[in-house]
Amino acid sequence: NLNALRDWGHARDYVEMMWLMLQQDKPDDYVIATGHQYSVRDFITTAAKHLGITIAWQGEGVDEVGIIDAFDESIIAEKLINEGTDKDFIARTQLSHLKDIAREVALNPRLKPGNVIVRVSPHYFRPTEVETLLGDPSKAHEKLGWQPKVKFAELVQEMMDNDFIEARRECLCKHAGFSVAAYID
C-alpha cells in the first residue's frame, strides 16, 4: 500500500533511547518513535532519487504505478566506482569490471524514462493493514532529553547505500563469471 504512513526511524536512535531509559532511577514507559510520518511512496521516491531516478506516479490504489520520469545514470556510475570501496583494491582488481557494469546500467532498457519500475501487488496487501502508524515521543523528549538524530532521508540513504554495496558485490561476481543466488521478495 503506497499510501500507508509509517513512523520510520533508525535503530541507532532507538537503541540510544533504550539506553537512556535504562539510566533512569525509576522505571517508566516511553514511546520509541520519531513523531514524523512518511508514506511508502515517499520512501520509494527518496530511495530512487538516491540512485538518480526521478519517479512520476500515475493511477490510484492497486492501479498506481511509478514511472521513470528521468534517470541520471552518472549517479549510479559514480556510486559503482567510488563509494564504499578501498581505492587501492579497486585500482588493482575491480575498476575495469565496475566501468563495464556502469556502462551496462546506463544502457539497461528497463531504466529509460517512461518505463514502469514500481507496481502495486495485491499479494502484499494485508487484511488487517493499519493505514497510519505514528508514535508520540514527547515524553522521551521531555524526561530523557532524547531526540532522534537520523532524518528520514538519511535513513533511506543509509539503507540504499548498504543494499547498493551488496548489489555491486553481486554484479562484480557475476561479471567475473561466478554464480550468484537469485533473491525473490
Question: What are these regions, as identified by a protein language model?
Answer:
Residues 1-185:
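C-terminal substrate-binding subdomain of Rossmann-fold SDR/epimerase-dehydratase oxidoreductases
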